[in-house]
Amino acid sequence: MSNWLVDKLIPSIMRSEVKKSSVPEGLWHKCPSCDAVLYRPELEKTLDVCPKCNHHMRIGARARLDIFLDQDGREEIGADLEPVDRLKFRDSKKYKDRLAAAQKQTGEKDALIAMSGTLEGMPIAVCAFEFSFMGGSMGAIVGERFVQAANVALEQRCPLVCFSASGGARMQEALISLMQMAKTSAALARLREEGLPFISVLTDPVYGGVSASLAMLGDVIVAEPKALIGFAGPRVIEQTVREKLPEGFQRSEFLLEHGAIDMIIPRNELRPRLARLLAQLMNRPSPVALPVTA
């Protein structure tokens, strides 16, 4: 019996372990909507949209900018700016420790990335929120990078686009974070005075101080399908009003139906459709229609 264990069973277990370890981590991804198990390389081809149920999964800010902007001529805006714990804030953890953990997890200094570049050859300034960095919360650096991007748009006489994904103002920066609502709104007012378009793209989720400021100030407000958009979350509202909310409440389709946003565009159509829209707003020749990615 012992020889059989040594000669047959143990090598079999070892071979099984080798097979398990040979499968790279992260090769498969489970759709949070339909539970389909998806092959990661195939999912990347669909821009992280489930091919089974069309669920638009959350993607990082750099991935967002990479699929939106032309490949050449990109320049990051405000990359040297880093958050500072001016208030020495502490809740269950020190704010500086939360920042360090978020920076290590995401590889980013803060929750917004801004770039100048081109879209189908048209100069453009673009911002994208990184939701993985403290819930995409807006603090001093997020506000400053957004304003710098707006200033680039003013200097270059080009449009500004922002992809929002945020839980709202950053609690750990208190009034400093709330001030960013006014600061970013003032920057957008300057763009409007100069006749330069701002397109706000709402992705899942957009809440709090971001939804109450820059995200809803677009000349055109676009959303991805089924994105959650609001000020307070549905559970908070239900507890306050003590009523059951309507089906699909705070989803982008609900907001479109009630006139709060202008259009819903699937992720694989955002680049060509926004390029054509911005060309019209900037009185430029419309770019050649791009093939829609499957």
From Swiss-Prot:
One of its GO terms (molecular function) is zinc ion binding. SUPFAM superfamilies: ClpP/crotonase. It catalyses: N(6)-carboxybiotinyl-L-lysyl-[protein] + acetyl-CoA = N(6)-biotinyl-L-lysyl-[protein] + malonyl-CoA. It holds the Pfam family Zn_ribbon_ACC. It comes from the Bacteria. It is found in: Cytoplasm. Pathway: Lipid metabolism; malonyl-CoA biosynthesis; malonyl-CoA from acetyl-CoA: step 1/1. Binds 1 zinc ion per subunit. The keyword Cell cycle does not apply. Acetyl-CoA carboxylase is a heterohexamer composed of biotin carboxyl carrier protein (AccB), biotin carboxylase (AccC) and two subunits each of ACCase subunit alpha (AccA) and ACCase subunit beta (AccD). This is Acetyl-coenzyme A carboxylase carboxyl transferase subunit beta. It comes from Ectopseudomonas mendocina (strain ymp) (Pseudomonas mendocina). The lineage of its organism: Bacteria, Pseudomonadati, Pseudomonadota, Gammaproteobacteria, Pseudomonadales.
